[in-house]
Structure formats: C-alpha cells, structure tokens
C-alpha cells in the first residue's frame, strides 16, 4: 500500500510485493524450524505442536525423504504410544533442519534481491535489515 501511495511504477510495486512475499516465506520457514529446535518457553506453545497437530512443514517433508517410515506415523496420526517421539527423532536426526535453514536463507536472499532497484536510503537500509532479523531467530 505504501508503494501505491508513494507513486511507485508497476515494476517497483512488483519488487516490493516480492520483497514482502519472500520475507514472509523466510519468516514462516524459520518458525517451522523453531517448532523442532525451540523450547516451549521460547515458542509460547509446546514444541513440535505443528507436527502433533498434523501440519506438515518443510522440515517434515525433508525428513520424510530420509525416513520413509515417518509418513506412516503421520498417516496414523501418532496413535501409538511413542509415535510422536519417534517422529521427532526422525526429523532431528536427518538433514531436515539444515536443509530448511538453507531454504530460509534462500527466501531471505530473494527478498533482498527484490529491492535491489531501490536507491540507497535509510528506508532501503531498514528494509534490508529485516531478512537478517528474521534469520537471527535461528541463532
């Protein structure tokens, strides 16, 4: 909306849209990682609550590539005792978290690239700090 109100061209509006979309995707992917690596206190909800609720996120899909048995646990909705713990171990012992981190970094880079057309200014510098802030939640 700010781009429209400030008279940006169609291509500039597209760049601003791509910035916001890719930044939002980076944020969501970081949130997906934290669901497996964060504490209940950090998250404000139980860790692994997305998986327990049946939400399949990037780490889960990546882990299923390495651990096909994970799909069966998810399909039966963790009905057996220990299913959720076993699923968590499959995700944590795989390359799912590092691969998802790479995905978040890609989205963050794409958000920065989307506003490369902007001339240097305090506003642009502030926007360019946002992807780094999103990624900083991982460390």
Q: Which ranges hold each PLM region?
A:
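All-alpha prenyltransferase/terpene-synthase fold signal
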Residues: 1-139
